[in-house]
Every structure is written in structure tokens, then in C-alpha cells.
Amino acid sequence: MEKVPMTAEGYKALDEELKRLKTVERPAVIAAIAEARSHGDLSENAEYHAAKERQGWIEGQIAEIEDKMARAQVIDVSKLSGEQVKFGATVSLIDEDTEEEARYQIVGEHEADVKAGRVSVTSPIARAIIGKETGDVVEVNTPGGVKAYEITKVEWV
């Protein structure tokens, strides 16, 4: 079983989503199925078929989240330190061409949200900077071509 690295915050978010699916969504869809059944003939009952489809989706989501949580390797970022970039680090970069600053935290795949400054450990930018240190310049293959970034800061927040 392959372990899935994730931050404690990512694990907590998965746990909250799982609880919501089990305590809110699952009972609601069961009630919707019961309501649709009460309307009689199920062969032409669109409400029933829609509710059953939704139930299948919810059960799939629950199974997927439970699998991720079972395989989770939770990494407590607050206990990490050092200048070398690794999973969980928050890294400040400067684009060598445009002088634009960027700040990203390296997180697990399901936690990634570029707009919130979280990039997947498997993303091109993360793969390029992992193992590097403050002051290093890295080249990243982007859809727009190769870009050079200087690592200006490594934080553990």
C-alpha cells in the first residue's frame, strides 16, 4: 500500500469532509430515495434515479476519502526545520526574468490549491525545488517554457 504524504491540516480537512458526507449527505440522499419510492413506479421515476445516482457518487467519495486517510502519512510541518526544501516547506521564490515574487507550500496532491499558495509535491515547481536551499537557482519546465527561480526563503509554518 503506497503511503500518501499530507499535512496535518490536509488530513483534518479530509476527516471533516468524510464526516459531512456520512452525517449530512448520506442521510439526505437516503431520505430522497425513500421519498421518491413513495411516488410509486420506479421504472419511470426520475427523482428516484437521480437520488440513486447521487447516492452512488456519495458512496464513491466516502470510499475514496477513507482510502486516502488509510494510506496517509501525516507530516507535522511544525516539527520540521532547516534550509533544505522538502515536503511541507513554505518556499519564497523570485522569478529571475520578471522579478516577481511567489510563495508556495509543498503539500500532498489532494491538498494542492495554487490560488491559495499550495502546490502538489508532484508538481513541476515542487519537483524542481525539493532538495534545494536558500540562494539556489532552479529551472522549472512550465507550459510557457523554462523559467528560472531563485529560492529566497524556506519556512516551516
Swiss-Prot record:
Pfam families: GreA_GreB, GreA_GreB_N
Sample GO molecular function, one term: RNA polymerase binding
Keyword Transcription regulation applies: yes
Record keywords: DNA-binding, Transcription, Transcription regulation
UniProt-listed SUPFAM superfamilies: FKBP-like, GreA transcript cleavage protein, N-terminal domain
InterPro entries named in the record: GreA/GreB_C_sf (IPR036953), TF_GreA/GreB_CS (IPR018151), Tscrpt_elong_fac_GreA (IPR006359), Tscrpt_elong_fac_GreA/B (IPR028624), Tscrpt_elong_fac_GreA/B_C (IPR001437), Tscrpt_elong_fac_GreA/B_fam (IPR023459), Tscrpt_elong_fac_GreA/B_N (IPR022691), Tscrpt_elong_fac_GreA/B_N_sf (IPR036805)
UniProt superkingdom: Bacteria
Keyword Transcription: yes
Family statement drawn from the similarity comment of this UniProt entry: Belongs to the GreA/GreB family.
Name listed for the protein in its UniProt record: Transcription elongation factor GreA
Organism of derivation: Phenylobacterium zucineum (strain HLK1)
Highest classification ranks of the organism: Bacteria, Pseudomonadati, Pseudomonadota, Alphaproteobacteria, Caulobacterales
This protein's encoding gene: greA
